[in-house]
Design a protein with these regions (language model features):
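A conserved long alpha-helix in the C-terminal portion of kinase-like catalytic domains
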Residues: 224-289
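A cross-family kinase active-site recognition segment
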Residues: 74-77, 81, 99-156, 180, ...
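Regulatory N- and C-terminal appendages and interdomain linkers associated
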Residues: 1-10, 289-310
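Active-site acidic catalytic loop and adjacent metal/ATP-binding pocket
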Residues: 24-34, 40-41, 170-215
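ATP-binding glycine-rich phosphate-binding loop
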Residues: 8-35
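A conserved alpha-helical element in kinase catalytic cores
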Residues: 2-8, 42-86, 101-115, 119
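Active-site Asp-x-Gly
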Residues: 195-244
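Conserved short submotifs of the Hanks-type protein kinase catalytic core
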Residues: 85-98
Length: 310
């Protein structure tokens, strides 16, 4: 059915085979055309999924040919859409490769990941502004982080030493002196599609925007990535000479604040299981970083005037 509907989205489209990739949230199929080219045809089943797909389509349109030409890997490319019962059916290029598995990352693959991240962060920001993608300054990033810390502190569930660690990071003006870049915005291991030891595609760009490049590195600072993250960061820095001095420290900070966000999500929505899970994660983080200078976010604290100081 999806392959037949695809002809309305892409005139002249001729499917010869289709493989279902459907989930409870969406109908989807991997479709091959008469030229043996692979396409992804999707149709949301739920309103939340429709909203997600709309965000993906918007980001895909912002990934212009000019931006794509600067990347050594493939990204989603939307070829057509059509309305089906009030929802949007889309036809896009099927991205090749297999999802990155952290336990199987070799030094060569780690270098490829670092290079891919650097390429994203070196894209010109002007194109995203032309497409009205969100833009967050360094000061905006600091204010967001400080807001999360303040809200988490108000729960009374943070160990005092962990709270002070986060407050110190917010108070360090040097940590927040960086140039914003194009960022993926939802980066994690599963976004990378690989062929052998090379990154061949990156998916899920719905949060594409201008912001702190450290956000795209946060996933690397979690314990499960420790076996290869140093190699990724080394490759990233060698591929992007303009990377700021404290990008790795901010990446660690954003990863820690993700735990605070999880805690706040549970509290805001009254989900006890989430609150319990997040509280355990907070304690585990506290135990891991307490007294370990290798885990420091800022050392020493900058003496520069704080950006929010009046």
């Amino acid at each position: 059915m999806l392959s037949a509907l695809a002809t309305s989205a892409v005139p002249g489209f001729q499917a010869v085979s289709a493989q279902s990739l459907s989930t409870p949230e969406r109908d989807a199929a991997l479709v091959h055309d008469v030229n043996s080219f692979a396409w992804l045809v999707e149709l949301a089943r739920t309103e939340p999924e429709e909203a997600l797909m709309s965000a993906r389509h918007s980001a895909a349109r912002a990934l212009s040919e000019g931006l794509r030409s600067r990347l050594s890997f493939r990204v989603p490319k939307l070829h057509g859409t059509t309305d089906v019962g009030g929802k949007t059916l889309s036809v896009s290029e099927y991205l090749p490769g297999r999802e990155l598995v952290p336990a199987r990352v070799t030094p060569i693959l780690a270098a490829s990941v670092g290079k891919a991240l650097a390429e994203i962060h070196q894209l010109p920001t002007s194109t995203l502004l032309d497409f009205d993608r969100p833009s967050q300054s360094a000061l905006d990033s600091l204010r967001e982080a400080a807001g999360i810390v303040d809200r988490a502190a108000a729960t009374g569930l943070l160990p005092q030493s962990l709270l002070r660690r986060w407050e110190t990071a917010c108070e360090d003006a040097g940590l927040w002196q960086f140039e914003t870049t194009v960022i993926h915005g939802l980066m994690q291991a599963s976004r990378f599609l690989c062929d052998g030891e090379q990154v061949v595609a990156i998916e899920e760009w719905r949060e594409l925007r201008i912001g702190d490049p450290a956000r795209d590195l946060a996933w690397l600072t979690t314990p499960t990535m420790s076996s290869f993250s140093p190699a990724v960061i080394t490759s990233y820095r060698s591929s992007r000479s303009s990377a700021d001095r404290y990008v790795a420290q901010r990446a660690r900070f954003w990863a820690e604040l993700d735990i605070a966000r999880w805690l706040l999500h549970g509290i805001d929505n009254g989900i006890e299981k989430v609150i319990e899970d997040a509280t355990d994660m907070v304690q585990a983080l506290h135990d891991r970083v307490s007294g370990d200078l290798d885990q420091a976010l800022t050392m020493p604290i900058s003496t520069n005037k704080h950006p929010l100081a009046t």
